[in-house]
């Protein structure tokens, strides 16, 4: 999948179908929208693009996923390219300028697909109905997706963000369409886990990302062609008086050196709060309890359940 940054880069080589939105979380309503756009693109034999935004679009709200994490999902959903528009550079355009200058002239969009609550243009003055009218005036078409609910409530990024901050991972998974994950390159830690007999992989937490509930999670870690079960701690390791929040994952039944490699940690379920133990021996005993519980609760995890392949 190709990545473009607007207005620094524009894609002008032919016509396309564009899925429009901020897509924070790429939840089940977003996935439904992108799948609609994909089917249209396939039928019209046109490339499928995602048009989204960078910058403070949501008034300082914590992001569910970083752009890099979203790219991985976009590609798995069939996108040929993604355009990241600098929100600060385009926020003062009129709705007419947004459609005619960016979507149609610069990007070659002939069919756009957006959600019922999509807003665009100066002061968010453009809405779904004006998108349909402006695309038609430009010789194109806009398809508007209806609201999607789950459990009687609208599926929204705000709702998912609240679930993640409270550790309700299974509920978040049902709205996201796949387990929430973090991605990064494995860093060297202080080797504490190794000295306890539980070597861990350490990933930095994304700046500006959603604040996850601190504690221990049951997790899944794809490495190569295999999915491993894991136990992930999100927090500061209070037993050893560390300060920065990071993630440490003990990967069950894995032996290998993956320092410097990029991996994904899927958080399946919240197990317990982070605890400051009196001694390392007490911590080791608890990790064994966590490990045995994880083994008992883990079933076979498929690539499809992780939203992959």
Go through each PLM region and give its residues:
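Active-site-proximal cofactor/substrate-binding loop regions of enzyme domains
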Residues: 39, 46-108
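Phosphate/ribose-recognition catalytic cores of enzymes acting on nucleotide-derived substrates
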Residues: 189-309
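Short beta-strands and strand-loop turn motifs
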Residues: 19-21, 51-53, 82-86, 111-116, ...
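Short acidic-hydrophobic, aromatic-tinged amphipathic segments that line or gate anion-handling sites
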Residues: 2-8, 83
